[in-house]
Amino acid sequence: MSALSFTLVRLGTLVRLAFRSAGNRRVNFWLTLVSIALSTCLLLTVQRGQQAIHDSFTRAVSGTDLIVGARTSPLQLMLYAVFRLGDPTHEISWEAYERVRRNRLVAWTIPIALGDSHRGFPVLGTDAAYFGHFRYGARERLQLAQGKPFEQIFDVVLGAEVARRLGYRLGDRLTLTHGTGDAPGIEHADKPFQVSGILAPTGTPVDRTLHISLDAMTAIHLNWQAGAPIPGINIPADKVKAFDLKPEFITAALVGLKSRAGVFNLQRDINADEDEALLAVLPAVALNQLWRLLDIVTRTLQALSALVLVLSLCNLVTALLASLEQRQRELAILRAVGARPLDLLFLLVQEGMLLTVGGALLGYLLLTVGSLLAAPLLLNQWGIVWPVTRFAADELWLLALVAVAGPITALWPAWRASQRALADGLTPRL
């Protein structure tokens, strides 16, 4: 037998011994493996969560130069105007919106009116410019999977996720609820809507939004005052066209410019409006504020996850050291039948690698199962597209780091085992 063949046989024997040794200590083995798996899963979850939030928020709106709303924090304005998160504290008048729309620097505007919902999904009032100018991702246009945009007053266009979750089809009828979120509210039961279109999936908050016209938003509130129906006054749906349906207020507006060179001039003019307290925000600036906030949270979670992993590796060292006392005779017998100190070193390093490689794979499996369960909830509640499988370089490097940490951590106990004298395990203690 050649030297290479002999070495391979020897290594194969040691690998089999490592597996059998782990089987003989299965309780300690599995406890250590599960702790490594959980810490790996936690690290990967933080890493994937950071990327999922970044990707979802970044692709939600593109090609919009300014977001205009009532004066508040830039981040809050962007969150409720684009991502439907939170509630607006103030509105802007239609006259203020018209002043922005007529500005010589402005190419197009999209009015946005919020405040109603349907079974927990937000309702957005807008006009035809929304379907013509709104962009997401890599400046992609909204596409209708079925039907057409709203033409009649009580037409509604559904986002893909709304239609899928609630099972709506073209021609179905539904009623809206005053107020946002899952809290119970007063239904606009006297003015039902008909589904005229269903948008193709976008992976953005558009998917979980119902879209109606601004005229419709005004119509369902004709007999309302201070957030409640006026007692004794009922305006049937077939009579609303007799009224002026121009809105008095809207929530916000998305603005596109003829040339981006004028964005700061227009922003300054809007923020300095003398008739109304307005705020114009660059989406990129507001997103940077969000990234700074998330960066603090992410780094904290990463540090905690890394600490949990270090504790799991310390547990691995402790388990190997504790097993040395129980395995003195086993190791001595291996020496007696011809195992060299280097073989014992390799044996225990193999056990450490077995634990961390198994823990890394189990951790990734736990992450995948958790992602399958959490992805629909995250998309529905916060509009975050959570990838179920993601073979990105950062995750692969993290898995490799965990796998390599095992044999490195096991070197010290393995070295101690290899230095034990043959007589230590074969001489009975009195």
Regions found by a protein language model. Give the residues of each.
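Short helix-to-coil transition segments within interhelical loops
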Residues: 22, 335-342, 420, 429-430
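Hydrophobic, regular-secondary-structure patches
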Residues: 41-132, 148-152, 242, 270-272, ...
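N-terminal Sec/SRP start-transfer signal
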Residues: 1-44, 55, 349, 422, ...
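Mechanotransmission and gating elements of multispan inner-membrane complexes involved in transport
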Residues: 187-194, 198-298
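Alpha-helical transmembrane segments of integral membrane proteins
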Residues: 31-42, 295-318, 352-363, 398, ...
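Short helix-loop junctions at transmembrane helix boundaries
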Residues: 361-401, 411-420, 424
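Transmembrane alpha-helical interface segments in multi-pass membrane proteins
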Residues: 308-311, 321-375, 405, 413
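Hydrophobic secondary-structure segments that place a key small or acidic residue at a functional site
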Residues: 117-129, 137-231
